[in-house]
Amino acid sequence: MISKCTFSATVFSLFSLCWGAPSSPVLEAPHTIPLPAAMRVQTGESGFSLKNGVRLPEKNPLSRQAERIFRDNGINTALVKNNADIIFTEDASLGREGYRLAVTPDSISIASGSVNGTLYALQSLVQSIAADKNGAPALPRMDVKDQPRFSWRGLMVDSCRHMMPVRDIKKVLDLMERYKFNTLHWHLTDDQGWRLPIAKYPRLTTVGGARAQSPVIGNRNKGDGIPYSGHYTADEIRDVVRYARDRGITVIPEVEMPGHASAAIAAYPELGNTDIPGYEPRVQETWGVHSYTFSPTEKTFRFLEDVIDEICALFPDSPYIHIGGDEAPKNQWKQSPTAQRVMKDNGLANEHELQSYFIRRVEKMINNRGKRLIGWDEIQEGGLSPTATMMVWRSQMPHIAAQALAQGNDIVMTPNSHLYFDYDQGPGKPAAPEYETINNNQLTWQHVYGLEPVPQGTPREREKQVLGCQANIWTEYIPNLPKWEYHVFPRALALAEVAWTPQELKNEKDFRKRLDRQLPFLDARGVNYKRPDNGAPAQPKAVITRERR
């Protein structure tokens, strides 16, 4: 007769063998994107078997993240008190985003300096899953030591022209996590809509969040006659911020000023230049640049201070507030006696200096709340604050980046020559009329992959001021997620490698092989990417239409 104690020990031993047994030989090397900084893989040998899942240490808080990531990739997990398969250790020398990863037939060890480093190690792990010789899932033996080249690896969501529902933003965040992006730039206010809830000023969303119509997709000169409105609630904003945080992503909010302010001024007309002829503010129904700018008065600055207070509460994780600062026409300020009086009282020579004065006033509010100002490269016009961070988007003006770096400012590279993903991916004709774009620039994934974020001629001692790079996706002609995905993927994977991988390790042919191995994952997630071979949408039945809001 077998005693109960002996039987329990036997079952536990079998359970341990079942979970911890080495795999059959793993023949396939990882197809990780972005490519790690240093990786040694031993194929043709036994690896770590995933046939029965992974045991995680139940008392380690990192196991919650590991459980989520493994299960999202079809691997079972179990929380155990002893004999865990993954060993987590902390190593501050690896920095905030670096990690070490070792896989043997018996265990997986992850060392990192923070939760973010652990997340990146886990993403490298699940991207390395392959079939062993018997067809079972396994990890090859490997050693990885990795860290990103740049600290800012971003994508932008423009919710003003077309509003992206929270469920879709979460899908975007899931994809960003896989490819080690760490910044979501959320464009929340513009001429065509204000989507950010500000409790003290409810008309910003009830009035500023609604436009009478939009241009027909593919024809900016013709209206569709369909009202369009919407905004996020405070709870939705907090939900997105939390969801992003769990995936190692910081959400940077953008509120446009002093230009691109039509929606705010339509909601509260006293914020505009009320003393000019023909003053009739409204939420704009057409795309492009519009003339309505905030008036540089104390009333406006009190309003902006209130808005910034609420932004800080909604986005506590963000070290920055993005204030736009781009494409601010000066004609209303030139016509406004009030604006001219502000210029005279403050010794400002022209309207460009008035814009700089405006931005410096706002920057002081932001800095006083423990955050930093970031804006588009036009914030340099009239003089740039030494503590501001600048997003460089005008590739046709390379001196802008050089001037900011020479002054000591940090920059993020978002050049429209490479990283405006609303531009057509090319090559090939659009799959259908609704896939047309108004811009015929063909920015292929190869073109994106060829980007060098550090501007040519940058002195070595200034290179650290180049924080990284980001793709911008303006949504005038991108009405919903399937069209957004068609523009963003696979180019986002090329950008992920540009932003992460050491320059000397980049290889376009090798990247293409790894890209092809990523496509089944995108297919499984229902991503409507543009197929790199023929330009067709991956989800041909996806509906590319503007939802009535």
Curated annotation (Swiss-Prot):
Domain of life from the UniProt record: Bacteria
Activity sensitivity to pH: Optimum pH is approximately 7. Stable activity from pH 4.5 to 8.5. Retains more than 30% of activity at pH 9.0.
Signal peptide span: 1-28
Keyword match 4Fe-4S: no
Active site positions, chain numbering: D190 (charge relay system), H260 (charge relay system), E327 (charge relay system)
Thermal dependence summary for this entry: Highest activity at 45 degrees Celsius. Has about 40% of activity at 55 degrees Celsius.
Catalytic activity, reaction form: Hydrolysis of terminal non-reducing N-acetyl-D-hexosamine residues in N-acetyl-beta-D-hexosaminides
GO cellular component, one term: membrane
Binding residues for substrate: R161, D326, W393, Y420, F421, D422, W474, T475, E476
Enzyme Commission number, as recorded: 3.2.1.52
Keyword Transport set for record: no
One example GO MF annotation: beta-N-acetylhexosaminidase activity
GO BP terms, alphabetized: glycosaminoglycan metabolic process; polysaccharide catabolic process
Residue numbers spanned by region Disordered: 526-549
Record entry for activity regulation: Inhibited strongly by Cu(2+), Zn(2+), Cd(2+) and Ni(2+) ions. No effect on activity with Na(+), Li(+), K(+), Ca(2+), Mg(2+) or Mn(2+) ions.
Annotated function: Potentially capable of cleaving the specific glycoside linkages in the process of mucin degradation in human intestinal tract. Hydrolyzes chromogenic substrates pNP-beta-GlcNAc with high activity and pNP-beta-GalNAc to a lesser extent, but not pNP-beta-glucose or pNP-beta-galactose.
Similarity comment: family membership: Belongs to the glycosyl hydrolase 20 family.
Name of this chain's protein: Beta-hexosaminidase Amuc_0868
